Amino acid sequence: MTATAASKYGGFASVFISVDQIYYGACEPTETVITASVQDTQNVTNMVAFFRLVDKVTLKATDWNPAISMQDKGGGTFTLNLRATDILDYKKYNDVWVSYQLVGANKRGDPIARTQIVTNSITLMACP
């Protein structure tokens, strides 16, 4: 499990990634679990994740996916099982980074916690 330093994130205590490389095709693992904990446990009531792919050579990025809701585990902790098939255009690449940003909101839907855009902590590869 890898952790990203909490100081990089506005309103986040921690962000953990269960595995840093996922595959599409017959190889395992095909998903990673993202677990995020917020500092403001009383007011952050929902969280969404945005994803795009970044080519490791050219650094060109795809468009962002529509927001994917994360599961509220209680106590300011949210999780998402991210599968390769959840990301737009995943089959167009053999070896790319999955770039992501997490956004936590209050009951009115106002963003009150947001990570930086994280680019190189998850690799997506075609099954060799």
Which residues does each PLM region occupy?
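Glycan-association/targeting regions that enable binding to alpha-glucans and other polysaccharides
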Residues: 1-128
